[in-house]
Amino acid sequence: MDKIQKTDHFYLIDGSGYIFRAYYALPPLTRKSDGLPTGAVSGFCSMLFKLLEDSKSDQNLQKPTHFAVIFDSARKTFRNEIYNEYKANRSEAPDDLAPQFEYIRKSVMAFNLPSVELPNYEADDLIATYVEKILKIGAKVTIVSSDKDLMQLYKKGVRIFDPMKNKFISEDDIKNKFGVDASKVIDVQSLAGDSSDNIPGVPGIGVKTAAELINQYGTLEKLLKSAHEIKQNKRRETLIENKDKALISKQLVTLKKDSPIKIELNDLILKEINKDKLYKFLREMEFNRLLSSAISTYGEPKLSSVSAGTKVLEKQKP
């Protein structure tokens, strides 16, 4: 198998983020033949199709040579062992979304793309691990996600594309959000906490104050070591009393860059679309509009006709 080259370009897709964006951004949809909810699957496929085509015309860096869709494996991860209340405020997936997860994973296979997930780890950790491996080789990577937690990975050789805003994130965007550069995002998050993930942080300290403190002291550890020097009584006492919460929060927000992923970089190579496989899936899901777009983009299937493909499927039914 060919070695990874410095000219290679990896696209790492936050698949879990795509799922929830597809579910909440689009109206409900069901498959007419059996009533299966398919709105999230349809939206996911449409976004993936668009991303694949847009990435092939990437003029800012280069076209992708490798591509992977990365998913969360389960709600519980190693972070729950560090802090039992981590994400405890999250509700279960909606009843009409849960049955769609299986088909979303099947859709990635239909597009002939590798998907990656690992028990006990979040998608963000796997992305961070791949980024670390890619940068060590000297190749480039584009992360596709609207998740602010991935901003800590921004550096030379790494781009972040926000599909919600349809733009690439810049260093200025990160500074505007966190008040610090990307290398210090973790420290700000450790102090400010994150209510959406139930990360405690330090009570009474928000992002703005956290940024001021980190810009002044450099790191969370240096700040906590010098907390007794802070002149504001309340702030000083709060930091001293909540030192452990801040340190635990840092463990929670720091992405793992050494997750034990078994799927290697070479396995992420971008393959040609298998038209028969993709069109069969789209027809089974009754995504007629997307099927039409796919045929227009990739050409007619190898089977004699689309209707012939339908006959084959009908014969397979019990």
Task: Give the role of each language-model region.
Residues 5-7, 56-68, 113, 136, ...:
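Non-catalytic nucleic-acid-binding/docking modules located in mid-to-C-terminal regions
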Residues 2-144, 148-170, 245-248, 254-262, ...:
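Noncatalytic, basic helical substrate-engagement surface that gates or grips nucleic-acid strands
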